[in-house]
């Protein structure tokens, strides 16, 4: 059973993630900073892994949100099930992790493409409150592919 979370928490995390992914894309465009972009994509992949395994409430960004941001906000109008955002973290892990592994095998364009794709999804969530991974989760539940 998943927990109920403040829906603003994952958006806060998506804002941090989209910033890191934008830096990753920028660094991946120059051969001199390609190694740094690869390392940063690895760190982001670990962050996605943490969120996929532990859920958004137990993610470091969730901790930062609870301690630094939420006390300054009014109570949320409603809570959301954490299953969708947790699934979105898994999708992020698959995308970013693929780019990281491709980078290990010398496919450096994979770093840029994966980081850009993950940035697109994270930015949609942060800026427009549209969680692409959550929508995939809902679609797969409707198709009865997952529970």
What residue ranges belong to the model's regions?
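Membrane-interfacial helix-loop segments of redox and metal-homeostasis proteins
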Residues: 1-147
């Amino acid at each position: 059973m998943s927990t109920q979370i403040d829906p603003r928490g994952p958006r806060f995390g998506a804002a941090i993630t989209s910033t890191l992914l934008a830096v990753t894309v920028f660094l991946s465009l120059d051969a001199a900073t390609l190694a740094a972009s690869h390392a940063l994509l690895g760190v982001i992949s670990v962050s996605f892994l943490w969120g996929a395994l532990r859920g958004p409430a137990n993610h470091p960004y969730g901790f930062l949100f609870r301690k630094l941001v939420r006390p300054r906000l009014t109570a949320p109008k409603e809570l959301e099930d954490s299953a969708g955002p947790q699934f979105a973290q898994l999708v992020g892990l698959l995308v970013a992790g693929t780019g990281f592994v491709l980078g290990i095998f010398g496919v450096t364009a994979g770093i840029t493409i994966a980081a850009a794709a993950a940035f697109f999804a994270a930015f949609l969530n942060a800026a427009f409150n549209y969680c692409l991974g959550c929508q995939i989760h809902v679609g797969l539940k409707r198709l009865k592919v997952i529970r």
